[in-house]
Amino acid sequence: MNRFVQNICFTVLVLLYSVQGLCQTSTADNAEHDHAPQAAIASAHPLATQTGLAILEQGGNAFDAAIAVTAVLAVVEPYSSGIGGGGFYLLHQKEDDSYVMLDARERAPLRAHKDLYLDEQGEVIAGASINGASSAGIPGIPAALVHLADNYGNLKLPQTLAPAIGYAKDGFSVDEYYQRMATFRLKALQENSAASAIFLQQGEVPELGYKVIQRDLAKTLEIIAESGFSGFYENGLAWKMVRDVRKHGGIWTMKDMGTYAVKERSPEVVIYKGMRLVSASLPSSGGLVLSEILQMLAEFDLEEMDEVQRIHFIVEAMRRAYRDRAQYM
């Protein structure tokens, strides 16, 4: 395992167009909003969405579906959703109307320091924080899958991870988006023989329909399914990863792996025109940025504006919120 394309997996709800249609509300108007009669799954890839629905049909709950969807995305979206990264999960339990945010963000190695990506002259080493072993953080997604299954799911990991294991073993077909991302990262992939052998076709961007097969990833998912946290973070697989990262200039240690832990946090809550929105809290910036945008827009009657003015107000609110994020967060 000597590829270090760091992939960060995020479960994201994008609330940009029609906030009213996606929010819980504490007002009497709640009955007017449409709700899915059973379940709705949205993901970045049809195979992941189909898998989530299949898990629900097998008796799984929403958390089991989230595990399965995350794992399949880790297989079919290696450019953005791999298990080598981290993510956030926003959970709601109907029984007690409680919310929790799982913080499974990847973590910097304990030996990381502020000058890690500077040379002896104090200059930034180009690409060092993006490519290579020194750029890799301690993965959080495997721990998140285990945490979800142990604390919230109805099904066991061997069942929820089985579809992803199958796609990793048997392969999935390259689509146009995969081609675009492979083109974007072509140089980095070509410079790593292991990555090139898996994600490229004879060293070049694969043709449409080319099967990407990831047998080592399948084995890793099988280890997680069988042995949970210890299988990935404490035993032989962890030792192999640490050894390989250090061989290629990284600073991982077994302590980094063994001390990783998912954190349960209180989510960010904002009231917008009588509706309660629950979003991700720190260390994600999403909830705070969304809150700032909506608090600015709450001062205006967007429905009374013409389309051009409404878009202008929304864009300016977003621009200011993201400026604040860049400066203060």
Where are these regions (language model features)?
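Bacterial N-terminal signal peptides that target proteins for export
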Residues: 1-9
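N-terminal signal peptide c-region/cleavage motif recognized by signal peptidases
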Residues: 18-19
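Noncatalytic scaffold domains of N-terminal-nucleophile
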Residues: 24-50, 54, 62-227, 232-234, ...
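Protein kinase glycine-rich loop
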Residues: 292
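Internal maturation/activation junctions in enzymes
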Residues: 300-329
